[in-house]
Amino acid sequence: MSTHRTLVVVAHPDLATSGINAQLAAAIRDIDGVTVREIASVYPDRRVDAAAEQELLRRHDTIVLQFPWHWYSVPGVLKEWMDQVLTYGFAYGAGGDALHGKRLQLVISTGGPEAAYTPTGHNRFTMAELLRPLEATAHLCGLEMAEPLVLHGAPRATREDVADHAARYRELLSAVPAAAN
C-alpha cells in the first residue's frame, strides 16, 4: 500500500514576521508524508517554476493551502502561484485532470473575530460565502474540498489559542489518510 502524501503550500508574504502561520507550519513539519513548501521563500521574486510546482502537486494526494486571510481573499503570493501553476491543460480543461480526485484543505488565519464573519457582523458575510471563489476553483480543478480549518482573531490569539489550533492542525493532517479513503 502506498503512503498518503500531503503537500502544504504555506503562502504568507513574510513568514518570518508571522507569529501564527510560522507556528502552524512548524507544528506539522515533522509529520510523515507531509511536505511543507513556503512559496514566498522559494519564489521571492514571484517567478514561479510552474513545472516544478505541478510535479509536486502530481506527487501528492492532499493539497493544503495555508495562508492569512487578506482583503477577503488569498494573499497575492498565493494568487500569483495559483495563476501560474493551475493552468489549462494541467488543472482544468482539455487534458487538465492532474488534480482530479485529490483533496484540498484550506488552513486560514483571519484578523477579525469569528463574529465578524456573520451576516450581521462587521464583514457582512460568512467565511463559507467568502470562500466560494476557492470552492469554485477546487470544483474546476476536480479537487474534493474539505471543511476549512480557520483561526479567527489571530492577532489577539493567546499562546494557548495558537497551541490548541496547531494541535488541531496536526491532528487533521495526521488523520488525512483515513479521511481521504
Model-based region annotation:
Residues M1-R37, Y169-E171:
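N-terminal beta1-alpha1 ligand-phosphate binding loop
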Residues R5, A25, R29, L131-N181:
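Glycine-rich phosphate/pyrophosphate-binding loop and the adjoining helix
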Residues L7-V9, R37, V64, Q105-V107, ...:
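Hydrophobic/aromatic beta-strand patches that form the interior of the parallel beta-sheet core
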Residues L15-A16, Y43-D45, P113, A157:
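Flexible, glycine-rich phosphate/dinucleotide-binding loops
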Residues G19-Q23, V48, G76-E80, E160:
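Generic recognition of short, well-ordered alpha-helical segments
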Residues V34-L57:
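N-terminal beta-loop-helix "entrance" segment that forms/cooperates
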Residues A51-E135:
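Helix-loop-strand module that forms the ligand-binding subsite of alpha/beta enzymes
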